Amino acid sequence: MRKRLLKIMAGSALALLSLSLLSGCGKSAAKAGSAGEVYVYNWGEYIDESVIEQFEEETGIQVVYDLFETNEEMYPVIEAGGVKYDVVCPSDYMIQKMIENNLLAEINFDNVPNFKEIDSRYTEMSKSFDPENKYSVPYCWGTVGILYNTSMVAPEDAPTKWSDLWDEKFKDNILMQDSVRDAFMVALKSLGYSMNTTDEAEINEAKELLIKQKPLVQAYVIDQVRDKMIGGEAAVGVIYSGEMLYIQNEVKDLGLDYSLEYVIPEEGTNLWLDSWVIPANAENKENAEKWINFLCRPEIARKNFEYITYPTPNKGAFDLLDPDFQNNKAVFPDEDVLQNSEVYKYLGDQVDSLYNEAWKEVKSN
């Protein structure tokens, strides 16, 4: 979600250079649309560049492609309307906020026949933020879990619950997410509460639990959790499932004498979903729908998954994957493992302020 800060590589010169070559222009050029263009606003490192090239070749539509780093950076750009993007890829809770503030256009699904390829499991998940599935088409999904190093954690001590992150045996070896909602999700779930609670008493209880945990935490991190865990710098870390294929490949390529295992805690976790939406002021709406439809083609969705490694909600693409991918439970967990999980919801500015103030207290304590 984010929110998905772990997937953000937008700051790398390589990513920016390659995308600028593809688009031929940046945000300043996105102020004027034409029938032969589509203006795309997406996370960094979140599409196979050859997919963009193939779309341009097949449709004759020029893709102007810009990057954002967080949902919170993206939202005011769309709200202000000065830069008229045609298609954007926000996360669940931010899509809800955009719908509530009339920032999105309804998608004409007659122009997106490949929507049928999206597994009903994920269209049902979408209803938590897009109740009638009018405004969004799922692109990628995943979970948040605990990664642990088998050389630093004995089998009998392997974490199975969020509450294990308060165990003294992991002192100075815990990596927590440096994100208000993700940190509070861990605490709230360990207390048996909803990660979308609006109850001030529950939020405060979670705050006190996070403060209690601080002496055990080595660091609050974002992107660094992946490399720190691969480097054996910590025993356990909170991480997004989309990182797992990269991590597993790195461990293998480096010939490490340990493995890094991923666990979805039994209290449940955050199920996140990033989806394509069309801003209400889009000037190339039909081209945006062609873009979405193209990305829903099973062979395109498979190709894209193999590049970005974040789980695809496309059932046709899943059927085309190598069995090693299909059977990787860190990436595609069984449904029963997810029974107690939730999708983040937009809680409103007042409740957001409660969380933000509580997080400030945690970090400053």
What are these regions (language model features)?
Residues M1-E37, N365:
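Short, low-complexity disordered leader/linker segments with a strong preference
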Residues E335-N365:
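Conserved C-terminal helix/tail region of periplasmic/extracytoplasmic solute-binding proteins
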Residues P279-Q339:
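Mature extracytoplasmic/periplasmic domains
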Residues A30-M98:
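Early extracytoplasmic/lumenal segment of secretory-pathway proteins
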Residues A105-K116, S136, L254-N270, P279-A282:
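Short beta-strand->loop
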Residues Y75-P76, D92, Q96-W141, P155-S163:
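Hinge/lid segment of periplasmic solute-binding proteins
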Residues G145-M152, K189-G192, W272-N284, K303:
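A bilobed periplasmic-binding-protein/Venus flytrap-type ligand-binding module shared by bacterial periplasmic
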